[in-house]
Amino acid sequence: MSELNESTTSKFVTINEKGLSNFRIHLNDAGEGEAVIMLHGGGPGAGGWSNYYRNIGPFVKAGYRVILKDAPALNKSDTVVMHEQRGVVYARSVKGMMHVLGIEEAHVVRKSMAGAGALNFALELPERTGKLILMGPGGLGNSLFTAMPMEGIKLLFKLYAEPSLDTLKQMLNVFLFDQSLITDELVQGRWANIQRNPEHLKNFLLSAQKVPLSAWDVSPRLPEIKAKTLVTWGRDDRFVPLDHGLKLVANMPDAQLHVFPRCVHWAQWEHADAFNRLTLDFLANG
């Protein structure tokens, strides 16, 4: 297998869905076999490649077609003000992308805010949903044990409102357990993504005013999700509370939970080898 990189796997598709008319979605596409769509979270500067470049190679080597999709209004995808719950819009964008690419069914890997999109996708399009892998997903309402919004979400909104290198470093400090991993390369790469399209920042805040995060709660519908699901969480997550993982496995008919120690909100990056082994085994045997 030749070495994968961002530029050689990069492409755009144009989708037409409700609220996303003639809308360009950016993705990185590599490999052949069953489709695995990986969807990043909602922090400023987030993108498919930056979130999952430590995972795409092992998944392709294992025989999967891997698609790293940029969410609407993030990274290289077109921008938009969302008038509905973000998870609904995210799910709709996945449906549109799958239609253009000719993919009938896909396994879905989603984290953080995009986790709400995975849950909505599985609810609305169960026949097109393979297995689900969720990492600290949003969209599950309040916590029994933790005041919300948590520290990481507060810093995320601060970075959207006041974009600066200092604010970015503050947010990254609560992304990772091992602070030595916050390198200049990581910071500058994320900062370049933030600066690529300032409209993304403005539109995120406008969208949040129209539909607050507190309105995202698919908990009552969790028992309807029949897909086999692996839920993963960082024990030290400072964005989404760990007890939400228990809520998922208590209410979804076929869900299991794995908690990574010494891990905050980026298991697929901070513990890439362990994450890849766990998730590939789940896809093959779960």
Curated annotation (Swiss-Prot):
Record flagged with keyword Hydrolase: yes
Gene Ontology molecular function terms on file: 2,6-dioxo-6-phenylhexa-3-enoate hydrolase activity; 2-hydroxy-6-oxonona-2,4-dienedioate hydrolase activity
EC category: hydrolase
Gene Ontology process terms (BP): biphenyl catabolic process
Site features described as Transition state stabilizer, chain residue numbers: 112
One GO CC annotation: membrane
Protein encoded by which gene: bphD
Organism superkingdom: Bacteria
Keywords: Aromatic hydrocarbons catabolism, Hydrolase
Protein's job: Catalyzes an unusual C-C bond hydrolysis of 2-hydroxy-6-oxo-6-phenylhexa-2,4-dienoic acid (HOPDA) to produce benzoic acid and 2-hydroxy-2,4-pentadienoic acid (HPD).
Subunit structure, interactors included: Homodimer.
HAMAP family with a match to the protein in the record: Biphenyl_BphD
Binding-site residues, substrate: 42-43, 51, 111, 180, 190, 266
Pathway: Xenobiotic degradation; biphenyl degradation; 2-hydroxy-2,4-pentadienoate and benzoate from biphenyl: step 4/4
Gene3D superfamilies: alpha/beta hydrolase
Catalytic activity line of the entry: 2,6-dioxo-6-phenylhexa-3-enoate + H2O = 2-oxopent-4-enoate + benzoate + H(+)
Active site per database record: 265
Enzyme Commission numbers on file: 3.7.1.8
Protein name, UniProt field: 2-hydroxy-6-oxo-6-phenylhexa-2,4-dienoate hydrolase
AB hydrolase-1 domain sequence ranges: 173-271
Species for this entry: Delftia acidovorans (Pseudomonas acidovorans)
